[in-house]
């Protein structure tokens, strides 16, 4: 009988490695508060934005919900999700200052950003492009044009490099939100807006008149997206990575993808299909 109990204990420990030792970092904090604070962008469709009922929705929000369910399973308690709106400028500071526990939006994973925050496995792959009114007929000719972009983003950095390398003289106009960008485009205050192509598609869809816009097919950057969390928190990162890997292995990620991209993506990109294969890491 003792032998059977010992074997059962070993099996339980392997099925949930984190239960085999004391909780640390964010997991310990969540166990005490029974709450996880999720940072999200309010105007980054289809990755994260406010739905018609005023609640956060989107591709990244769904991924974070899967992480929360895994945390509840590990802790054995119900965990409340508290959504905290963040901006492009303060999202990483919010993690550093312990105001949020997990950043769920359209965040590009870079080496330099890894100096201040940590990242999960990749959750999406996209690239920066331009959106303009169809009537402007912009075709990669931005000489003397006004180009809007969100400050503090990798797109802003890539845009500055693109214009410098091409020796194009254009005015960069920083906008606070995607809604402001749409208004600026419609009023003619800017000639084009630069952002991740997937974000541009989402913006067009919620504008109310998507056929008025043209999104250039060419990309001028590589944007690997991931969820972000605090540095030096290996246990919490392991939980998130385990969830993401399982979504890829089980192909459940395809259901989430179709929910948010199926209406305008006739077929998945080869880069995303490759991402599924590469991130389906064995348990």
Q: Which residue stretches match the model-derived regions?
A:
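A ligand-binding cleft/hinge motif common to bilobed small-molecule-binding domains
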Residues: 90, 104-115, 158-163, 186-221
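Short beta-strand-to-loop elements that line the ligand-binding cleft
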Residues: 75-87, 168-178, 184
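Ligand-binding clefts/hinges and TM-proximal coupling segments of bilobed small-molecule sensing domains
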Residues: 21-22, 157-175, 211-213, 244-283
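Extracytoplasmic small-molecule ligand-binding "clamshell" domains
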Residues: 21-104
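Extended ligand-binding regions for polar small-molecule ligands
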Residues: 21, 27, 58-70, 136, ...
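Periplasmic-binding protein-like
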Residues: 42, 124-132, 197, 204-245, ...
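Acidic, polar ligand-binding/catalytic clefts
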Residues: 65, 76-142, 214-217, 280-283
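Bilobed "Venus flytrap"/periplasmic-binding protein-like clamshell domains
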Residues: 40-46, 56-73, 107-108, 126-179, ...
